[in-house]
């Protein structure tokens, strides 16, 4: 469970790797909790839906869903009911990840639905323009992630630092309440420090930690320079 604290923020997306499924997911979440307790960094995890309930009831860090569908309870077989992820113990959700894109009107509907349930929202975007549009919808977070860098090991802060800086500036001009995160290619302490130096409040990452030989050690390295 648990509320989302102040910066710095590390959001660990479990995606659908076997390394972050079932027992592995629980182990990863507990390791994340240990790092959060040892360092004071606000670490949040996004497990797969079937793992939310167990993880949310066994760790004391925020657990969020990877997606919600903008549906009401009823005949929607296979859909992700927002009330269900809340009942399972999630305190928020990703929206519009590059691997689960939705239309702008769906982003708007998902934010409003999440707000009505008290779920925090992290909207993923791919450029400055999309980030600015998302900011008008009043999410809690916008995470800028150029899709070509996701999983590349090349952090956006290196080839395109201006994207982060201009996204932060644009969003804060539109809606200063929205907190900006940086994603794509993040894996080291230098990457996180650079993201914060560019004006973001934290990072969204996955494979750099999930697929590491020692995920806990990788997380400790990630937060070592802030």
From Swiss-Prot:
Which GO biological process entries does UniProt record here? gluconeogenesis; glyceraldehyde-3-phosphate biosynthetic process; glycerol catabolic process; glycolytic process
Domain of life per record: Archaea
Gene name of the encoded protein: tpiA
Instruction: Tell me the pathway.
Output: Carbohydrate biosynthesis; gluconeogenesis; Carbohydrate degradation; glycolysis; D-glyceraldehyde 3-phosphate from glycerone phosphate: step 1/1
Q: Which UniProt keywords apply?
A: Cytoplasm, Gluconeogenesis, Glycolysis, Isomerase
Entry-linked Pfam families: TIM (PF00121)
Q: What is this protein called?
A: Triosephosphate isomerase
Q: Which reaction does it catalyse?
A: D-glyceraldehyde 3-phosphate = dihydroxyacetone phosphate
Task: Please name the source species.
Answer: Methanobacterium bryantii
